[in-house]
């Protein structure tokens, strides 16, 4: 599970050859959620309101990069790119 970003204690990562729809995973402490890249909604899991707000804000800024990484995740040897954290 390559880490692609980290900010305010939130870790963002993707799995290679993960299933559709395009999504990423966010972990904050003991909480973990799978987030749809397009809608920015939780598909599975949970995050606190504060963490989810930060994740959605970050995902809006980096949607193209997230989609690139998800496309890479489908390849036999993915080339994940690190994405800048939320400032």
Question: Model segments located where?
Answer:
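N-terminus-biased detector of the onset of the functional/mature region
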Residues: 1, 37, 41-49, 75-87
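Short, charged/polar N-terminal "headpieces" of proteins
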Residues: 1-22
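Multi-pass alpha-helical transmembrane bundles in non-GPCR membrane proteins
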Residues: 2-9, 30-32, 57, 61, ...
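Generic structural signal for residues positioned in beta-strands
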Residues: 11-13, 34, 82
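A short, structured beta-strand/loop element
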Residues: 15-49
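Short alpha-helical interface patches
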Residues: 37-38, 42, 52-53, 64-69
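Short interaction-prone segments
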Residues: 47-50, 54, 59
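C-terminal structural segments of small proteins and small subunits
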Residues: 56-87
